[in-house]
């Protein structure tokens, strides 16, 4: 059974005593980590909570009886050549460097670019984690935090929001605003309190996603709902943490979605509830790079789009205003980017 690993794993197998390993697992679960590397003999630790336990059986990483990767201790050139030989031979390769100062991380990342093997680097400090994610701009596929004790995990709290790079949005000029009749709109209630100006990337075309902001603002008629993004019509695309898109109609409680904060950083948020209701809709068209794009939102003053002057209510939006958008080329097939010619109107 092949599994998709997240950008951050926790390692507990390297510690000598059972109590030390148990403390790491407990602390990792309290911090919200979901994938932990264990020793095969630590079966009892699976019952500390609901998480994905990956067993380190020698060099082999096992899940549900299947090898999903290799854990390689890197001490010199010989092990580096072994690492290179595993390209496209295993789904995941975890590198545990003996000395970060002499590890040619750039060589690893360049060798494994566009490979079928994901490369993870074991790190002990947040500085090492950032280096691993930023080397040669693209960075490694993920990191494995290798703590000496539970207290070490606290230092990585900021790294979790750094899993995703800052997204610099472009501006599009609003060219048309028109009311529509009733339609099915999707309201996403998250398990997080979202900031003013924070929102999700949503649009009618996958090549242009608008920043639809959270309902973190007070209104004359309704209290703020800082956990909510009134996302728009059911047909719309929304950007997910793995870089794919989904239709809003597919979103359900328990999903993870991507949220863009006002400083440009991205974070994942959990969906607690989705409401699809019939509401009056609003069609907004904008032009960027010589092309025209659109988004369909509920016609209500609590719905706001991100703009250079802040989050602006769709009730106050005017022709000629600038709104923030995320542009990309190509198309999407089942949510994945495709280098193809496509025309979405």
From Swiss-Prot:
What family is this protein classified in? Belongs to the archaeal-type DHQ synthase family.
Query: What is the role of the protein in this entry?
Result: Catalyzes the oxidative deamination and cyclization of 2-amino-3,7-dideoxy-D-threo-hept-6-ulosonic acid (ADH) to yield 3-dehydroquinate (DHQ), which is fed into the canonical shikimic pathway of aromatic amino acid biosynthesis.
For this protein, the record's HAMAP family field holds:
Arch_DHQ_synthase
Q: Which domain of life is it from?
A: Archaea
**Cleavable signal peptide:** none
The alphabetized UniProt keywords are: Amino-acid biosynthesis, Aromatic amino acid biosynthesis, NAD, Oxidoreductase
Q: Which InterPro entries match?
A: DHQ_synth
Which EC class is this protein assigned? oxidoreductase
Q: What is this protein called?
A: 3-dehydroquinate synthase
Q: Which reaction does it catalyse?
A: 2-amino-2,3,7-trideoxy-D-lyxo-hept-6-ulosonate + NAD(+) + H2O = 3-dehydroquinate + NH4(+) + NADH + H(+)
Gene name per UniProt: aroB'
Q: Which GO terms describe its molecular function?
A: 3-dehydroquinate synthase activity; dehydroquinate synthase activity; NAD binding
The EC designation for this entry is 1.4.1.24
Q: Which GO terms describe its biological process?
A: amino acid biosynthetic process; aromatic amino acid family biosynthetic process
Q: Which organism is it from?
A: Methanocorpusculum labreanum (strain ATCC 43576 / DSM 4855 / Z)
């Amino acid at each position: 059974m092949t599994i998709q690993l997240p950008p951050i794993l926790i390692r507990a197998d390297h510690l000598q005593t059972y109590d030390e390993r148990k403390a790491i697992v407990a602390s990792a679960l309290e911090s919200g980590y979901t994938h932990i590397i264990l020793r095969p003999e630590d079966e009892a630790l699976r019952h500390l909570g609901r998480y994905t336990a990956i067993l380190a059986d020698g060099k082999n990483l096992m899940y549900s009886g299947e090898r999903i990767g290799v854990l390689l201790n890197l001490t010199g050139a010989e092990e580096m050549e072994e690492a290179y030989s595993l390209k496209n031979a295993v789904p995941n390769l975890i590198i545990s460097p003996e000395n970060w100062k002499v590890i040619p991380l750039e060589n690893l990342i360049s060798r494994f670019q566009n490979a079928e093997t994901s490369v993870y680097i074991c790190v002990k400090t947040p500085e090492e984690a950032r280096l691993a994610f930023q080397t040669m701009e693209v960075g490694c596929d993920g990191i494995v935090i290798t703590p000496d004790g539970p207290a070490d995990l606290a230092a990585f709290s900021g790294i979790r929001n750094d899993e995703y790079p800052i997204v610099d949005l472009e501006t599009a000029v609003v060219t048309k605003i028109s009311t529509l009749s009733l339609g099915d709109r999707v309201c996403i209630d998250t398990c997080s309190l979202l900031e003013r100006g924070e929102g999700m990337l949503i649009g009618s075309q996958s090549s242009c996603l608008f920043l639809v902001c959270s309902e973190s603002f007070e209104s004359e008629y309704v209290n703020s709902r800082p956990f909510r993004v009134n996302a728009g019509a059911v047909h719309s695309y929304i950007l997910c943490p793995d870089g794919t898109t989904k239709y809003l109609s597919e979103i359900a409680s328990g999903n993870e979605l991507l949220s863009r904060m006002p400083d440009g950083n991205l974070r994942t948020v959990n969906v607690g509830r989705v409401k699809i209701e019939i509401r009056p809709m609003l069609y907004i068209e904008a032009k960027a790079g010589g092309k025209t794009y659109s988004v369909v939102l509920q016609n209500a003053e609590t719905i706001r789009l991100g703009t250079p002057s802040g989050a602006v209510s769709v009730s106050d939006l005017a022709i000629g205003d600038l709104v923030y958008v995320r542009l990309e080329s190509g198309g999407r097939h089942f949510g994945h980017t495709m280098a193809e010619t496509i025309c979405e109107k």
